[in-house]
Amino acid sequence: VRIEEAGDEAIIRTALEKAGLQNDKMKFFVAPGNGFWFRDCGPICFYYGDDDKIGMLDFLYDPRRPCDDLLPSVLHWKFGIPNYLVDLAWEGGNCLVDGIGGLVTSTATYKHNTDTIGSMYWDGVDPATIKYKKKESLSPSDVKYVLSNLLGQRQTTIVPTLNYDGGTGHIDLYLDATDENSFYMAQMPEANEGWSDYDIAVGNSAILFNKRNFFGRKYYDNGALPFPAKDDGSGWDTEEEYGEVARTYANHLICNDHIMQPCFSPVGADGMPTAAWDRKNIEKMQKLYPGYTFYCIDMRTFDGSGGSIHCITKQIPADNPVRIIHKNIYGDVNPVIPDAEKQYIPFSAIITNKSGIKEPKLYYSLDGKQWNDVSLT
């Protein structure tokens, strides 16, 4: 947790303890800042080597927020994580990767790289000493080349930017993924068919769901995320009106088996939004993300800011990850291997950990209630 004053740590810990929330695993560090859009200014992390060591890619950030642009360097100094500078402007809210060479971003990245402001340098103490080097502006082909070599080696997909998304051009306002096989995408109501962004969103959907995943199959559509309404539950009159607030359910944070979920009405004692239309949308989200516990937060104070929960948080990956990659099984599956008594559905997975895998098991359910397991060999 970045704080700008050392005394803030005690205040935050006390507030968490009063709320009955665990905080013993939290680490605080003091550093200067300009804002709180940590998704965008924070590092994009990766694993490397046989021991799954953690590294950080430090992309250029908004030069109007130089202290925030320093965040990856500060993390490097505080925690010793290797930090690699990249002379490409790219914000984390416009980054969706699958961990196996697939990357999605928007054409806003092209616009952000037309200037000549490069990497910064300073004395490491006084933010007033911050200065920027100059660089050449990058063409769209230059941008795609860099991204394709760093994170999108298998496939780099760059989709058109929406016109009325709050001004960021970020894909995390309407696109999400929980695995390497599929996407979730927000869907505008049919009443908005005349909007320019409606057509762009439909086109982006066609682009994404015609791409091939790691297993050579088209990405699966996990379902349409609902579209937020006004406070009274009515729709937006124009896309310009919507763009002034740019509410979104997609901009949530997935943390283990919990989802920190934006909503747009007061949260009741049951943890759900109190407005009927808002509650109905969250209930739809719960069905789209089975197995997750939702923690709803009324984010109306962020209306017009261009972001929500996902935008103000940034994770550093686990230092001992278990990586599981497998082809998902969707819909009705016909048994393919006949047997006198049983019929089987073949399943395989790539499972890795630096300490090795002792006994992998597949857990499955036929009715969504009773779970069974079988050893993978």
Whereabouts are the PLM-identified features?
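The feature marks the mature, well-folded catalytic cores of soluble enzymes
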Residues: 1-325
